[in-house]
Amino acid sequence: MVRRLFRRTAVLFTFTMLLSGVSAVQAEQKPAAARPAPPAMSKEDMNAFLARPLIARIATVRANGSPQIVPMWFLYEDGVMYMSTRTYAAKVKHLQKNPRAAVVVDEMVAPTKNKVVTIEGTVEVLTTGVKETTTKIYHKYVGVEGSASPQAQQSINTPRVILKITPKKIETIDTTH
């Protein structure tokens, strides 16, 4: 419980800093020279990590400037992240006003062994190819059979848009070795 609360607080802090233009490194007290850089993933390892059915958290900026963080399913293809969401979701309104977003996908293997991919970028709200992309995302998380279920089909056929996140900056950490 405490670990989960700490993790959520750390994620919220990181997103708040990213969206406000202050990096987590700038927010720390230690000088950069005193901290070794955490080990990064190779591009191949990052692509394999993002191909797994993990949960992403996307942070958008509300009208009042505060962050909204939402867990989402995603698809990462050819260096671009795609998410499917309902047409009238709050995050869509936020992104139409301010297309900047931050996304994190992470996995805690053990208390000191983590894999993290953080993406900062701009988001386009797409209204074409929605059903096809949403179906691909569902295949990733519940398989072809699960995607054909009545519940999945109802969700897939709900009015939706695709969030196309084009990364401006990608950072990775892999402390599992």
Feature annotation, model-predicted:
Residues 31-60:
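Short, conserved active-site entrance elements at the starts or edges of catalytic domains
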Residues 50-51, 96-97, 156-157:
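Alpha-helix boundary recognition
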Residues 2-5, 11, 15, 24-37, ...:
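C-terminal edge-of-domain segments
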Residues 30-37, 88-140, 144:
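Short, structured beta-strand-loop surface elements
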Residues 54-86, 95, 103-105, 118:
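Short beta-strand segments
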Residues 74, 119-123, 165-167:
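A structural signal for short, well-ordered beta-strand segments
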